[in-house]
């Protein structure tokens, strides 16, 4: 049996290619209620639905920002929310040329018999959920698998379980019209060097693409959301050019050219750091059969959140900060970012959270 060739085939290919358009990327605004609560706590804002809606409206309705955004990942609550004037967020995004996406996983659980390694849950009723989300206007989905680097981690068991879980999710999405974003995140936590991260990334990505092929996933109708290849959070930092070289080499060795785009997660890097690293990859003269873009959450929102601080009078200032980050990352997808963006408060600070849960 060959790759998926059902009724959504052409639509999946078209939407995946569109999301990967050079000059554009993904805004990850799919934080769970608990996670956004932690972000709000940092600016002393109460975690209630109206504040969550107000912050997301601030982002989605920033004039000029969505020209740099091809897709927005939403949380279940946000997919059905409206602006204060009563316009559904899904319509706001579509009219601005950004495809709505949806987070479909249900978080991680520990794998028995391992050293606190995890697998991701959410396969039960996933087909039904995807059909419902497609009906509501979503056109792509996200599922996050999490692996750790340690003395004996990741184990082969954790690698295989997560690869199979991602592949099973991916084919269910495609059968229901959603482009699956395949996200095997290798956490940055630890003292490991960049070579160890590169090795683990290669092993994990190879396992993922083996599983995707076994599940007959249409690669042209998927996107990959990996971590950049970097030293661990407790190791000495390296230059963006080094990260670019290691990351692109890792992808060359593992990601088939049928995949239209690779959209990096920021993994707790500062806003500016994530942009500079992405820019260095796109400046690198090397074989890159896929476009290299972004799917940033914290790295697009941090300075915006700080500027807003939950106050209506700060909305314009916050939108200006958001526009700066969107434009900078758009330039980074083209390798033309000069590092000259006006840095808002928080743009240079590390956003790393140990054992990060989305």
Swiss-Prot record:
The active site is at 183 (proton acceptor), 225 (schiff-base intermediate with dihydroxyacetone-p). CDD domains: FBP_aldolase_I_a. The record marks 358 as: Necessary for preference for fructose 1,6-bisphosphate over fructose 1-phosphate. One of its GO terms (biological process) is fructose 1,6-bisphosphate metabolic process. Pathway: Carbohydrate degradation; glycolysis; D-glyceraldehyde 3-phosphate and glycerone phosphate from D-glucose: step 4/4. It catalyses: beta-D-fructose 1,6-bisphosphate = D-glyceraldehyde 3-phosphate + dihydroxyacetone phosphate. Keywords: Cytoplasm, Glycolysis, Lyase, Schiff base. SUPFAM superfamilies: Aldolase. It comes from the Eukaryota. One of its GO terms (cellular component) is cytosol. Substrate binds at residues 39, 266-268, 298. Its EC number is 4.1.2.13. One of its GO terms (molecular function) is fructose-bisphosphate aldolase activity. InterPro entries: Aldolase_I_AS, Aldolase_TIM, FBA_I. Its main location: cytoplasm. It is found in: Cytoplasm, Cytosol. It is an enzyme of class 4 (lyase). Fructose-bisphosphate aldolase that plays a key role in glycolysis and gluconeogenesis. Homotetramer. NCBIfam families: FrucBisAld_I (NF033379). Belongs to the class I fructose-bisphosphate aldolase family. This is Fructose-bisphosphate aldolase 2, cytoplasmic. The gene is FBA2.
């Amino acid at each position: 049996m060959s790759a998926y060739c059902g009724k959504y085939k052409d639509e999946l290919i078209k939407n995946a290619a569109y999301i990967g358009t050079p000059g554009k990327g993904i805004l990850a605004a799919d934080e769970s209620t608990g996670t956004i609560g932690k972000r709000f706590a940092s600016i002393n804002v109460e975690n209630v639905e109206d504040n969550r809606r107000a912050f997301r409206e601030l982002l989605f309705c920033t004039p000029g920002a969505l020209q740099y955004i091809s897709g927005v990942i939403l949380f279940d609550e946000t997919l059905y929310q409206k602006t204060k004037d009563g316009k559904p967020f899904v319509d706001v995004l579509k009219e601005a040329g950004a495809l709505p996406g949806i987070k479909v996983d249900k978080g991680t659980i520990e794998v028995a018999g391992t050293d606190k390694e995890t697998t991701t849950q959410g396969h039960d009723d996933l087909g039904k959920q995807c059909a419902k989300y497609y009906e509501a206007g979503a056109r792509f989905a996200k599922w996050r698998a999490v692996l750790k680097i340690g003395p004996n981690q990741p184990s082969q068991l954790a690698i295989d379980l997560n690869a199979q879980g991602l592949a099973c999710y991916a084919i269910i999405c495609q059968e229901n019209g959603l482009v699956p974003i395949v996200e095997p995140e290798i956490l940055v936590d630890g003292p490991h060097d960049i070579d160890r991260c590169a090795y683990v990334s290669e092993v994990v990505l190879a396992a993922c693409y083996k599983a995707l092929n076994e599940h007959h996933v249409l690669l042209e109708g998927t996107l990959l959301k990996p971590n950049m290849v970097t030293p661990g959070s407790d190791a000495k930092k390296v230059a963006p050019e080094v990260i670019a070289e290691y990351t692109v080499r890792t992808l060359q060795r593992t990601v088939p050219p049928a995949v239209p785009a690779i959209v990096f997660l920021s993994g707790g890097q500062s806003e500016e750091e994530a942009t500079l690293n992405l820019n260095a990859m796109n400046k690198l003269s090397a074989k890159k059969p896929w476009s290299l873009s972004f799917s940033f959450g914290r790295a697009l929102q941090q300075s915006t959140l700080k500027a807003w601080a939950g106050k209506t009078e700060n909305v314009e200032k916050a939108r200006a900060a958001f526009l700066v980050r969107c434009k900078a990352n758009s330039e980074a997808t083209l390798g033309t970012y000069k590092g000259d963006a006006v840095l808002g408060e928080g743009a240079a600070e590390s956003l790393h959270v140990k054992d990060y849960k989305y």
